[in-house]
UniProtKB/Swiss-Prot annotation:
Name of this protein: Glutamate racemase
Organism domain of life: Bacteria
Organism: Buchnera aphidicola subsp. Acyrthosiphon pisum (strain APS) (Acyrthosiphon pisum symbiotic bacterium)
Database matches in HAMAP family: Glu_racemase
InterPro entries membership: Asp/Glu/hydantoin_racemase, Asp/Glu_race, Asp/Glu_racemase_AS_2, Glu_race
Gene Ontology MF annotations: glutamate racemase activity
Keyword terms, alphabetized: Cell shape, Cell wall biogenesis/degradation, Isomerase, Peptidoglycan synthesis
This protein's encoding gene: murI
Matching Gene3D superfamilies: 3.40.50.1860
Disulphide connectivity of cysteines: none
Principal EC category: isomerase
Length: 262
């Protein structure tokens, strides 16, 4: 199984997969050379995704791909499924779930600008805004803050307030917030403290949905695992990567190595 993202947000998906399928072997591709995907063009996102799958598929016998990134999923998943003959799973902003939960009919959606601007997201926003007010924050800064938090950098309250200022000033805030990026679940506590010190809020990420899809597929398809190691690949060697190595120990990767995607 190949799981890939431009950062470590996708490790939250891997963590959940390990809980339900502890014997699965996996490759995690950290495309940190392209971090964050959210500020890239659709053309770049599509071509980069094709390059990642094609390159790794030539080296390792992968039989399932998990795109652990809302941006790539909303922009490129349909193209990737046509391009490759293996099952590819993606993760999407789960507005349908938010509609079932919201009580004040005000739903918040936080995602990267590329995710917000994708035709997929625009379509579902239009579909569900008929019966709900959907407040949107498109930002590429939040994923960067989450990555820094994992490396031990304190989260800046000032930066968070600047990002969420459009909601802070609302007379009524969303009571349900969709986390449209796998990084954002790392900042739930900080976001709640900024917006809802005395009120409750329900956060929705789409991890549970994609995990259910992956679990259902793997349990019914008898996938033959030819990879017998857990491998961590990265596209750029830098100081940020070195700071992540201690964090990665919990995932028990047996191989950590660079891969050239250029």
């Amino acid at each position: 199984m190949l799981i890939f993202d431009s950062g470590v947000g996708g490790l939250s998906i891997l963590k959940n997969i390990k809980k339900i399928l502890p014997n699965i072997h996996y490759i995690y591709m950290l495309d940190n050379e392209s971090f964050p995907y959210g500020n890239k063009t659709e053309f770049f996102i599509i071509q980069r995704s094709i390059k990642i799958i094609h390159t790794i598929k030539k080296i390792y016998p992968i039989n399932v791909v998990v795109i652990a990134c809302n941006t790539i999923s909303t922009v490129a998943l349909s193209i990737l499924r046509k391009k490759f003959d293996i099952p590819i799973f993606g993760i999407f902003p789960h507005i349908k779930a938010a509609e079932k939960i919201t009580k004040n009919k005000i739903i918040g959606l936080i995602a990267t600008k590329a995710t917000i601007n994708s035709s997929y997201t625009q379509k579902i926003i239009y579909e569900y805004s008929c019966s709900n007010t959907i407040k949107i924050i498109g930002t590429n800064k939040l994923a960067v803050i989450a990555e820094k938090k994992i490396r031990g950098v304190a989260v800046s309250q000032k930066k968070l307030k600047n990002i969420f200022r459009p909601w802070i000033n609302l007379p009524t805030c969303p009571d349900t917030i969709i986390l449209g990026c796998t990084h954002f679940s790392l900042l739930e506590k900080e976001i709640k403290n900024i917006l809802y010190k005395t009120r409750s809020v329900y956060f929705i990420d789409s991890i549970k949905k994609v995990i259910f899809q992956i679990e259902s597929y793997l349990k019914t398809s008898n996938v033959n695992q030819k990879i017998k190691k857990n491998i961590f690949l990265y596209s750029k060697n830098n100081n940020n990567l070195k700071k992540l190595l201690s964090f990665l120990k919990q995932y028990k990767f047996t191989v950590i190595k660079h891969i050239n995607l250029n």
